[in-house]
């Protein structure tokens, strides 16, 4: 969607007097918030559900970055160093990691943390999917039914498959890798190392100095950078061969070109990389990350 049109305006209840709970994206907080729509006019930042709002608009604002400006090694009035060559643009170093949000399958994922290389100003050394829980304790252990004999369906995160899977919990003891729903499990544990992402992306910081030459005061602007990241295992499957003779236009995700492409499905069997619409394919297989 057009972010400027559907996500950036402040909510507008409109002139009518109806009472329709709706959701709008607040660019200042980076969150979808509820408001009351009157029923007519208003603007496009008006979404029927929170899920719809987050799918269209969720972007995390990176306003809390901390920068360590270079030290002025050549202060004015230092006559002993007045003839030394001084670099006009000393490097800018980042103290903190950058965090962005991602949406896949119409729900927000956990934060991607992009770690900046020490003393480098143009790329990042690692990207990983993290959550607020202790991964070693809540996600890494194998599921444990416990000694009791109850029959309680639960979910656990399997680090080998990278998926949340169901198991039967006995009702007592066990370990922390034990969730009531698949959604909670994925929220806490779903993470994939993104080493294949091409992390030396085109993130080039533009330095802006004040009028006093060599001053340590500096601000850094960061442009939007997009990454397409495949997270769903079915998206790595090849296009399924046409075994049957049906003619059903479908879409599959091409992991080489990192795009969804059209193909003709024969009508029988499938490896999961088979989608009715282009939108369904992209929602399942592509994550748009924005710094």
Curated annotation (Swiss-Prot):
<feature type="domain" description="BPTI/Kunitz inhibitor 3">
    <location>
        <begin position="235"/>
        <end position="285"/>
    </location>
</feature>
<keyword id="KW-0964">Secreted</keyword>
<dbReference type="InterPro" id="IPR020901">
    <property type="entry name" value="Prtase_inh_Kunz-CS"/>
</dbReference>
<feature type="glycosylation site" description="N-linked (GlcNAc...) asparagine">
    <location>
        <position position="210"/>
    </location>
</feature>
<feature type="disulfide bond">
    <location>
        <begin position="244"/>
        <end position="268"/>
    </location>
</feature>
<feature type="disulfide bond">
    <location>
        <begin position="235"/>
        <end position="285"/>
    </location>
</feature>
<dbReference type="GO" id="GO:0005615">
    <property type="term" value="C:extracellular space"/>
</dbReference>
<dbReference type="GO" id="GO:0004867">
    <property type="term" value="F:serine-type endopeptidase inhibitor activity"/>
</dbReference>
<keyword id="KW-0325">Glycoprotein</keyword>
<keyword id="KW-0722">Serine protease inhibitor</keyword>
<keyword id="KW-0677">Repeat</keyword>
<feature type="disulfide bond">
    <location>
        <begin position="260"/>
        <end position="281"/>
    </location>
</feature>
<feature type="glycosylation site" description="N-linked (GlcNAc...) asparagine">
    <location>
        <position position="111"/>
    </location>
</feature>
<dbReference type="Pfam" id="PF00014">
    <property type="entry name" value="Kunitz_BPTI"/>
</dbReference>
<feature type="glycosylation site" description="N-linked (GlcNAc...) asparagine">
    <location>
        <position position="217"/>
    </location>
</feature>
<feature type="site" description="Reactive bond">
    <location>
        <begin position="245"/>
        <end position="246"/>
    </location>
</feature>
<feature type="domain" description="BPTI/Kunitz inhibitor 1">
    <location>
        <begin position="7"/>
        <end position="57"/>
    </location>
</feature>
<keyword id="KW-0646">Protease inhibitor</keyword>
<feature type="disulfide bond">
    <location>
        <begin position="148"/>
        <end position="172"/>
    </location>
</feature>
<feature type="glycosylation site" description="N-linked (GlcNAc...) asparagine">
    <location>
        <position position="95"/>
    </location>
</feature>
<feature type="disulfide bond">
    <location>
        <begin position="16"/>
        <end position="40"/>
    </location>
</feature>
<feature type="glycosylation site" description="N-linked (GlcNAc...) asparagine">
    <location>
        <position position="228"/>
    </location>
</feature>
<dbReference type="GO" id="GO:0044562">
    <property type="term" value="P:envenomation resulting in negative regulation of voltage-gated potassium channel activity in another organism"/>
</dbReference>
<comment type="function">
    <text>Inhibits trypsin and plasmin. Does not inhibit human plasma kallikrein, chymotrypsin, human neutrophil elastase, factor Xa, factor XIIa or thrombin.</text>
</comment>
<dbReference type="InterPro" id="IPR050098">
    <property type="entry name" value="TFPI/VKTCI-like"/>
</dbReference>
<feature type="disulfide bond">
    <location>
        <begin position="7"/>
        <end position="57"/>
    </location>
</feature>
<feature type="site" description="Reactive bond">
    <location>
        <begin position="149"/>
        <end position="150"/>
    </location>
</feature>
<protein>
    <recommendedName>
        <fullName>Kunitz-type serine protease inhibitor 6</fullName>
    </recommendedName>
</protein>
<feature type="site" description="Reactive bond">
    <location>
        <begin position="17"/>
        <end position="18"/>
    </location>
</feature>
<dbReference type="InterPro" id="IPR036880">
    <property type="entry name" value="Kunitz_BPTI_sf"/>
</dbReference>
<feature type="disulfide bond">
    <location>
        <begin position="32"/>
        <end position="53"/>
    </location>
</feature>
<feature type="disulfide bond">
    <location>
        <begin position="164"/>
        <end position="185"/>
    </location>
</feature>
<feature type="domain" description="BPTI/Kunitz inhibitor 2">
    <location>
        <begin position="139"/>
        <end position="189"/>
    </location>
</feature>
<keyword id="KW-1015">Disulfide bond</keyword>
<feature type="disulfide bond">
    <location>
        <begin position="139"/>
        <end position="189"/>
    </location>
</feature>
<feature type="glycosylation site" description="N-linked (GlcNAc...) asparagine">
    <location>
        <position position="119"/>
    </location>
</feature>
<dbReference type="InterPro" id="IPR002223">
    <property type="entry name" value="Kunitz_BPTI"/>
</dbReference>
